[in-house]
C-alpha cells in the first residue's frame, strides 16, 4: 500500500480524548479543528512553566539524496517505539509546505507505518498557519508601497526596499517582478520579487517567538528597507504594521496537536526550510512538549550540516534548549548514491560504492560529536532491497567508528520495528546525556561565524565574497554582530555544488548575498546558487494528485 492508503485506513481517536488521557490537557484548553486536530491554548502553556523539562532528542540525517533518508518517518517511528517501551513521548515536527508537496516530495508527514495523521490535512492546508504567515508578510508589503504612494513621510528609498512578497508555492516566474505598472494610480514603479512562505522572516519569527508579546516585538523589529541616505533603517513598527501582523498570527502562534498511526501525540507547528531558513519547528511547540512528556523527539531539516547546525546555533542558543542526544538517519541506498551509484541502480548490491559513500556519514558523525558536543546514534532506515552483506558491512563500519548503529524497520512495522533503536537512544539519554556546544561564539564577527561554519562543518578551505557583501557584514557588526548566522546553501552536498557527493573538502564557499533578519535575530548568508523561491521539477508531484467524487484524495506520498 502507498503512504496515503495506509494513512486513510488509520483508526484515529478524537484528539480531545487523546490529549486528556495521554497528556492531561483539559478539553477547555484545546481549540479543535474538526475531530482530529486541535490547537493548544497559550494560557494553558503558560501554566506549565514550573514543570520540569523532559529529555530532548534530535533526529537529523546524512546529506539528502533523491533516494530519500526517512528523517520524519524515523522521528515518528522512534516516538512510537519509545511509547511502546513505556517512555512517555511526544513528537515535534514542522508543518509541510505546499511548494514541495506539489513539487518533488508529494507530502511530508512520515511514511509507511510511521506517519502522523490526518495525513491529507497536514500536507495541505492543515490549520491555516502558513496562510496566516503569508498574509501577515504580504500585509507589510502592501503597507510599504501604500506609504510610498501617499507621500513617503518616512523617506523610504524604493531602490533599497528589502522586503519581498511571499506565496506558499514553488514558482520560479515570481523570483523577479515589477510592481506599480499602469500609471501613478497603481503606485510607485519598482522591482520586487517573491520568496516562498517558508523563507519568510515572519515564519522565522513565529518559530522563535516565546509569547504574543515577543511575537509583536519581533515583528516590529523587521527592517523593511532604508531611507534615502542609504544607512538609516526603516522598521515595520515605523509603518505601524506590527500590531495588525500580530493580530493575523494570533491563532497561528498556538501549537497544533495531532496523532500518529499508533495514536501517540505529536505537535506540528511552524515550517521553515533548513536550506533557505533555520529549519526547525517552533520554540513554543518544543518547550510545550518538554513540559508535557518525559521524552521529546524532534527533527531538523535536511542533513546535520544544515538543520542540526541551525538547531544548535540558532534555536538552542535563543531558547536555551539542551538536547540530550542526536539520532543520525542513514540508508544503504543513500550512502551508495554518495558513493557514485545512479538512482536507478541503487537497488543492486554494491559494497564498493557503500564504502565510498560512507565518508558522508563519517563527517556528519564527527560534526555531531566534536562540534555539537552530543552523543550520536546511527539509525539505519531499512529498505527491502538492502542486502544482508550491505547491512553487516555498514554496522561493522559504524562500530569501528565508535558510534552505535541500529537497524530500524519502522516504515514496514511501525513503532515495533524501532524498539531496538528506542532502547539504545533511551539508554544514552538516561545514562550518558550530552551537553551541546556551539560551533561559534556570540563574540565572533559575522564573517568569522560564516567562515567557522564553512571550515568546521562543511570541510571547506574558506569562504569568499565580493566587496559589497564584505562591507555589508562589516557594517552590521556594530549593532548585529552578536547575531547567529543562518546559512542558505544547497542541502545536497557539504559544498555549494549539489553534485559534489560524499564528503568534499578543500572547497571555497562563495557567499553571494547577505540579508539581515532583525526580527528573527539572525543574519542570512546565501551561498552559491541557492534560491529563496524554488521552482517546480519537469514532472511535478501535482500531476499525480487527485480527489474523487467522495472527496478522497490520492497521489500524496
From Swiss-Prot:
- Name the source's superkingdom: Bacteria
Supply the PROSITE patterns for this chain. Answer: FTHFS_1, FTHFS_2
Please provide an example of a Pfam family that matches this protein in its UniProt record: FTHFS
Picking any one GO molecular function of the record gives:
formate-tetrahydrofolate ligase activity
A single Gene Ontology biological process assigned to it is: tetrahydrofolate interconversion
| InterPro entries the record matches | Formate_THF_ligase, Formate_THF_ligase_CS, P-loop_NTPase
Tell whether Transcription is among the UniProt keywords. Answer: no
Q: Where does ATP bind?
A: 65-72
Task: Cite the HAMAP family for this sequence.
Answer: FTHFS
- Record-stated family: Belongs to the formate--tetrahydrofolate ligase family.
Q: What is this protein called?
A: Formate--tetrahydrofolate ligase
Q: Which organism is it from?
A: Methylococcus capsulatus (strain ATCC 33009 / NCIMB 11132 / Bath)
Amino acid at each position: 500500500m502507498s503512504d496515503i492508503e495506509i494513512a486513510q485506513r488509520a483508526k484515529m481517536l478524537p484528539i480531545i480524548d487523546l490529549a486528556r488521557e495521554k497528556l492531561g490537557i483539559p478539553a477547555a484548553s484545546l481549540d479543535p479543528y474538526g475531530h482530529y486536530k486541535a490547537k493548544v491554548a497559550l494560557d494553558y502553556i503558560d501554566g506549565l512553566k514550573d514543570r520540569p523539562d523532559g529529555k530532548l532528542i534530535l533526529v537529523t540525517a546524512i546529506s539528502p539524496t533523491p533516494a530519500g533518508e526517512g528523517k520524519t518517518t524515523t522521528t515518528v517511528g522512534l516516538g512510537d517505539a519509545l511509547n511502546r517501551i513505556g517512555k512517555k513521548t511526544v513528537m515535534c515536527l514542522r508543518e509541510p509546505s505546499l511548494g514541495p508537496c506539489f513539487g518533488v516530495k508529494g507530502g511530508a508527514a512520515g511514511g509507511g507505518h510511521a506517519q502522523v495523521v490526518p495525513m491529507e490535512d497536514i500536507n495541505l492546508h492543515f490549520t491555516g498557519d502558513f496562510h496566516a504567515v503569508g498574509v501577515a508578510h504580504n500585509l507589510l508589503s502592501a503597507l510599504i508601497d501604500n506609504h510610498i504612494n501617499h507621500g513617503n513621510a518616512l523617506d523610504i528609498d524604493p531602490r533599497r526596499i528589502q522586503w519581498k512578497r511571499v506565496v506558499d508555492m514553488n514558482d520560479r516566474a515570481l523570483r523577479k517582478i515589477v510592481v506599480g505598472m499602469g500609471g501613478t494610480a497603481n503606485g510607485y514603479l519598482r522591482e520586487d520579487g517573491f520568496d516562498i512562505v517558508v523563507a519568510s522572516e515572519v515564519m522565522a519569527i513565529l518559530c522563535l517567538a516565546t509569547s504574543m508579546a515577543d511575537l509583536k516585538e519581533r515583528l516590529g523589529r523587521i527592517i523593511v528597507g532604508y531611507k534615502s541616505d542609504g544607512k538609516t533603517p526603516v522598521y515595520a513598527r515605523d509603518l505601524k504594521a506590527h500590531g495588525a501582523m500580530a493580530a493575523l498570527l494570533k491563532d497561528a502562534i498556538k501549537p497544533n496537536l495531532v496523532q500518529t498511526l499508533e495514536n501517540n501525540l505529536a505537535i506540528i507547528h511552524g515550517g521553515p526550510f533548513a536550506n533557505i531558513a533555520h529549519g526547525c519547528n517552533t520554540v513554543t511547540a518544543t518547550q510545550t512538549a518538554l513540559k508535557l512528556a518525559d521524552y521529546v523527539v524532534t527533527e531538523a531539516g535536511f542533513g546535520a550540516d544544515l538543520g542540526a547546525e541551525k538547531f544548535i546555533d540558532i534555536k538552542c542558543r535563543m531558547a536555551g534548549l539542551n538536547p540530550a542526544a542526536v539520532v543520525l538517519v542513514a540508508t544503504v541506498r543513500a550512502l551508495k548514491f554518495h558513493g557514485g551509484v545512479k538512482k536507478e541502480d541503487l537497488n543492486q548490491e554494491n559494497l564498493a560504492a557503500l564504502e565510498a559513500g560512507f565518508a558522508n556519514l563519517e563527517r556528519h558523525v564527527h560534526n555531531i560529536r566534536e562540534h555539537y558536543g552530543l552523543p550520536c546514534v546511527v539509525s539505519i532506515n531499512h529498505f527491502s532491497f538492502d542486502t544482508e552483506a550491505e547491512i553487516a558491512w555498514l554496522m561493522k563500519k559504524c562500530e569501528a567508528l565508535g558510534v552505535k548503529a541500529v537497524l530500524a524497520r519502522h516504515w514496514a512495522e511501525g513503532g515495533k520495528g524501532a524498539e531496538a533503536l528506542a532502547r539504545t537512544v533511551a539508554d544514552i539519554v538516561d545514562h550518558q546525556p550530552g551537553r551541546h556546544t556551539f560551533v561559534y561564539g556570540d563574540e565572533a564577527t559575522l564573517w568569522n561565524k560564516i567562515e567557522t561554519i564553512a571550515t568546521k562543518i562543511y570541510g571547506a578551505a574558506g569562504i569568499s565574497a565580493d566587496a559589497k557583501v564584505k562591507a555589508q557584514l562589516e557594517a552590521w557588526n556594530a549593532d548585529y554582530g552578536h547575531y547567529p548566522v543562518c546559512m542558505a546553501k544547497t542541502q545536497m552536498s557539504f559544498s555549494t555544488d549539489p553534485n559534489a557527493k560524499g564528503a568534499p573538502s578543500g572547497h571555497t564557499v562563495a557567499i553571494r548575498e547577505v540579508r539581515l533578519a532583525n526580527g528573527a535575530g539572525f543574519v542570512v548568508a546565501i551561498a552559491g546558487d541557492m534560491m529563496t523561491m524554488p521552482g517546480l521539477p519537469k514532472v511535478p508531484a501535482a500531476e499525480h494528485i487527485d480527489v474523487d467524487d467522495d472527496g478522497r484524495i490520492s497521489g500524496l506520498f
